[in-house]
Design a protein with these regions (language model features):
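Extended interfacial segments that mediate partner engagement and assembly in macromolecular machines
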Residues: 1-97, 117-118
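PRPP/pyrophosphate-binding module of the type I phosphoribosyltransferase fold
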Residues: 66, 93, 102-181
Length: 181
């Protein structure tokens, strides 16, 4: 179980999301299972990873007030073709089914970006600039949203997605991830 932590970068440059909760460090077995699910097509691992994501729902920062819908961080269509599936959408779909909460796939990856894994914080922010947009016909005005991603490293992806959601009127954007680096 991870405890709340304070990030010096976030203190200097507050992110657009209201809070983020995660229960695991992305190393050892956790890192291995995430990588096998994402890159080796081991789709059956979604059960375990969805369970780990669900643990983050009990964090007081997440559970203190209800949310209207899960919002998966979207993959670009090129990545979906490469992997055969959208790993975050698969996890969120399973969580939504179990919890009877809706999924709003209201974000789309409008621009293909290089993998974030080798980039510094500054490079990650630049790489993601204008990479997401609200899907046409989507409305998040006044909604309390729970953004979902697999790994939190610098928070750049969550920040960019939350920025878009709040720019379109979301009341709050909290986030959960399977693990953090």
């Amino acid at each position: 179980m991870g405890a709340p932590f304070s990030c010096p970068d976030c203190e200097d440059h507050p992110p657009a999301f209201d809070c983020v909760a995660t229960r695991y460090q992305a190393n050892g077995l956790v890192r291995d299972l995430i990588h096998r699910f994402k890159y080796s097509g081991e789709f059956h691992l979604r059960q375990i990873l969805a369970n780990w994501l669900e643990e983050a729902l009990s964090d007081p920062r997440i559970s203190r007030e209800p949310f209207d819908a899960f919002v998966p961080v979207p993959l670009h269509t090129t990545r979906i073709r490469e992997r055969g599936y959208d790993q975050i959408a698969a996890l969120v779909e399973l969580m939504a089914k179990r919890s009877h909460r809706p999924v709003w796939a209201c974000l789309r990856r409008s621009r293909y970006t290089e993998s974030q894994t080798r980039f510094s914080r500054k490079e990650r922010l630049q790489n993601l600039r204008n990479a997401f947009e609200l899907r046409k016909g989507s409305s998040v005005l006044g909604k309390r949203l729970l953004l979902v991603d697999d790994v939190l490293t610098t928070g750049s992806t969550l920040d960019e997605c939350a920025r878009i959601l709040k720019a379109h009127g979301a009341k709050s954007v909290r986030a959960i991830t399977v693990a953090r680096r």
